[in-house]
């Protein structure tokens, strides 16, 4: 009998470990070889579901720890933990059938809280608060009933930015937007999330007639092609670092284009190797001026996430 029980225990142990899979992914989370990996993933079957742990491959730092209902890891269940490359928490919360449940929190890489809300079946219960990277409030959303919310937002210096109502996460009715000096910049009317009427004002409060430029994305002067050429011209493969075969290395850099078009707050969010990281960060920081973003008739800061790719062994 002891022999049978021992054999059974060994069989179960082998069975458990046989359901553990390891995978490598590139910068874009596509399966790849070990040499070109940015992430490393382990998926293991447990009594509660499929436990997935993702790591930043080069550093070994944990990127995610979460439980899934399915082997394909599409539907999260239970507590989930995410981390920045520097080891600080990125997000934490609980999922039920893939939807947020209970208090969920998000954090910037500097450790400041970026988002806090209480969820029920994926919907915000009562209030939601978000913050800028410097700790100033970004916006506040309050639930008035099952479908109606009121949202107020601020610039990162604490001055009012906007206010209005949301119905099922779509703007509804009258929305007001403000310049940094407190003057109203825009009065917009929405119906089921669609803009149906608007008036725009300059910083002195005067109504403006030409509304063609009240919204635009931040952009590099000369467009995407000029930006690509700038990166190609200034990037170089680090000295004394060689690959045996042709390879591509991608670094992830976050930065902000401020109201004057200057690149600020650049940081590496997806590192590869210290020498590559330094070069990528320097190129982004030394960028020529951009055209700043305009949102609801105000120049605003714009967040950008830029993949920076180095190639080896190619013409």
Name what the model sees in each region.
Residues 1-24, 231:
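Bacterial Sec-dependent N-terminal signal peptides
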Residues 19-263, 267-299, 311-315:
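Glycine/tyrosine- and acidic-biased, solvent-exposed loop/turn segments at the edges of beta-strands
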Residues 302-304:
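Extracellular and select intracellular beta-sandwich modules with Ser/Thr-enriched
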